[in-house]
Amino acid sequence: MVIKCAFKECRPYLNELETRFGLAHWADQSSGFSLHYDDTGLSLYKTDEPKLGAISVDFVTGAAAHRRKFGGGKGQAIAKAVGLNKGATPIVLDATAGLGRDGFVLASLGCKVILHERHPVVAALLYDGLQRAYNDIEIGPWMQQNMSLIFGSSHTLLAQCESMPDVVYLDPMFPHREKSALVKKEMRVFQDLVGADTDADDLLEFAYPLASKRVVVKRPDYAPFLNDKTPSMQIKTKKNRFDVYVKAAMKK
């Protein structure tokens, strides 16, 4: 049993998670992390840094709920980057889903978002968060319509895609330049768990032919262009920027 849990009645669900995402194989290959399940859902801990606390996915309460209600709607930089300010509600393929925060913002604004995640633990956390969101009275109906997960490498999945999404969204892991004490706990855990996306440059080559309207790449403000390709336009925030590679106009 990879996932630790005090509730026997939860074991069938946890066995399903372990099988679906190959967590036993991951546990055999990895050390320094532990997975726990309780009434708040699935959580990841870095065992040698307990003060960092738990990493989990919660779309229903907390920061996600606050951003959904008060985050600025279609005026947000990410919304402009995918073309929501044009009056469209595009189908977005989030090829580097992570914990799904950006995908959730877009789904809450009406986009249909397909999440790709290749790391088994991250995918399991994301899947668990989605199940709880699907069952929520308030957001469940539109979450079931607007947000779905496919587990696997985006390089493989993009090559297999038969239908063209309007937008392919990329947010590859990039080494953080700040001192470790200043980096968010989540980023520190992720960098140890997943590492940098050393094959990220290749993603743009897969993504561009697949997107019917545009590719959007989220980058730290100090990071170079992905694959050294100059974007059609940029939308900048305080710490990040969205490099937008436009192929065709958005239609309402």
Curated annotation (Swiss-Prot):
Catalytic activity field: guanosine(1516) in 16S rRNA + S-adenosyl-L-methionine = N(2)-methylguanosine(1516) in 16S rRNA + S-adenosyl-L-homocysteine + H(+)
Binding-site residues for S-adenosyl-L-methionine, renumbered to this chain: 101-102, 117-118, 153-154, 171
Predominant cellular place of this UniProt entry's protein: cytoplasm
Keyword Cytoplasm: yes
Compartment list: Cytoplasm
Alphabetical UniProt keywords: Cytoplasm, Methyltransferase, rRNA processing, S-adenosyl-L-methionine, Transferase
Recorded GO CC terms: cytoplasm
GO molecular-function terms, A-Z: rRNA (guanine-N2-)-methyltransferase activity
EC number from the UniProt entry: 2.1.1.242
Domain of life: Bacteria
SUPFAM superfamilies, alphabetized: S-adenosyl-L-methionine-dependent methyltransferases
Gene3D superfamilies per record: Vaccinia Virus protein VP39, YhiQ-like domain
PANTHER family assigned: RIBOSOMAL RNA SMALL SUBUNIT METHYLTRANSFERASE J
Family: Belongs to the methyltransferase superfamily. RsmJ family.
Function: Specifically methylates the guanosine in position 1516 of 16S rRNA.
Protein name: Ribosomal RNA small subunit methyltransferase J
Naturally occurring in which organism (per UniProt): Pseudoalteromonas translucida (strain TAC 125)
Gene for this chain: rsmJ
